[in-house]
UniProtKB/Swiss-Prot annotation:
GO cellular-component term (any): plasma membrane
Organism superkingdom: Eukaryota
UniProt-listed PROSITE patterns: CLAUDIN (PS01346)
Lineage, highest ranks first: Eukaryota, Metazoa, Chordata, Craniata, Vertebrata
Gene source species: Rattus norvegicus
Function: Plays a major role in tight junction-specific obliteration of the intercellular space.
Predominant place of localization: other
Subcellular location: Cell junction, Tight junction; Cell membrane
Protein name (database record): Claudin-5
Length: 218
């Protein structure tokens, strides 16, 4: 596969991952109610996200409430907000950088500089994936830990929501896409070639007697 094809494929994966990350950030399904007691007929399901919580009735009616106070939120929710939004914005910057250095655009003249710009964009995309992975894993760790904590009431136990799985998939796409962009750009950067200077000396003219020609002497 050519370097330009690698860049395009990587950019497509990064764009899909970026959309998935935005979707995961906005969905109120980071944790959902866990049904552990099958003898109890539940009339509603609770979803919780970074920006709102929703209650879904058994009839299908859903009512959501936006978090009004930032200070009242838990530390993991505040950190997840900051890191996820930061990853989304950084991915936007990475998009402009990658498009500037991509081989399919003419923003920069073709050459090593253009390839290094694309290489920077791919590295930024990979960094976005890692940045988004931190709050996702942190949040999931807290949900799992509270789920197995015997001191937490059954009614307050939650399971991993769909937004976490979408976020993990988006992070993987961002890192894989960024890696492909870097691979495609690395081919075009050009590797430095090292060579040793070769000195040539003019041949000496000699006479039949093996001495220098007398006309060389004054």
């Amino acid at each position: 596969m050519g370097s330009a094809a690698l860049e395009i494929l990587g950019l497509v994966l990064c764009l899909v991952g970026w959309v998935g990350l935005i979707l995961a950030c906005g969905l109120p399904m980071w944790q959902v109610t866990a049904f552990l007691d099958h003898n109890i007929v539940t009339a509603q399901t609770t979803w919780k996200g970074l920006w709102m919580s929703c209650v879904v009735q058994s009839t299908g009616h859903m009512q959501c409430k936006v978090y009004e106070s930032v200070l009242a939120l838990s530390a993991e929710v505040q950190a997840a907000r900051a890191l996820t939004v930061g990853a989304v914005l950084l991915a936007l910057v990475a998009l402009f950088v990658t498009l500037t250095g991509a081989q399919c655009t003419t923003c920069v003249a073709p050459g090593p500089v253009k390839a290094r710009v694309a290489l920077t964009g791919g590295a930024l995309y990979a960094l976005c994936g890692l940045l988004a992975l931190v709050p996702l894993c942190w949040f999931a760790n807290i949900v799992v830990r509270e789920f197995y904590d015997p001191t937490v009431p059954v009614s307050q136990k939650y399971e991993l929501g769909a937004a976490l799985y979408i976020g993990w998939a988006a992070s993987a796409l961002l890192m894989c896409g960024g890696g492909l962009v870097c691979c495609g750009a690395w081919v075009c950067t050009g590797r430095p070639e090292f060579s040793f200077p070769v000195k040539y000396s003019a041949p000496r003219r000699t006479t039949a007697n093996g001495d220098y020609d007398k006309k060389n002497y004054v």
